[in-house]
């Protein structure tokens, strides 16, 4: 399906971003709580200004299935906490050795590598605690959400993708291997976000599967556009180091700029096709897919 012209997507995304960021500020212990260095580190990366795309995906998926935003908000925060944790770990000297994240120095450059690792672990732990403390969700929904998110993080998800990425560094790999890496390292959390939103709404299995396919294609398209931005983007706009991935295989240096763009377009088309059964109700998710394709940061 195509996004509806009358949708004020900017207003929706901004409202979602504000809702998620406001809730994130409340879920962590206040500054000064012992040990203060830990909580300062957890807050540093988590609360850096961002699009909150994954959190918004939780909210939009829940609302698509007529669920309550308030029920989905803790799950949106949990997904954003996991994402922030993954960024901290990905930026480490032993991983990508990045110096810039969202326009600010990476956490390990501010607090040291050991404290950055502990902050990442703290965020992961806090994400699951937040799900279990979500009073608006039934016990079964909390269990399903915990199981789904832990699977997205683990060896069959984000961690597995990161290991495959590290092993591929400095090697020539084919498109299937590259897609495997990013379907797990990036796509798994997109899928979990959509599914957690559906779980919060009490969605049916067929609805969850449709959202799974939507998010699977969306997540991979997001990574391709990320590679395009890394190749040609301005750090002042993207908030990240430019050219950081030029010593490893990316969609750009494997497929070329035009080939990568065509692949992203095809994935967005597949993502939109997955929404067909929802009709006009899926206008937000359709608009979100178009934003991923056209992103500049």
Language-model features: where?
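N-terminal amphipathic/basic leader segments beginning at the initiator methionine
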Residues: 1-28
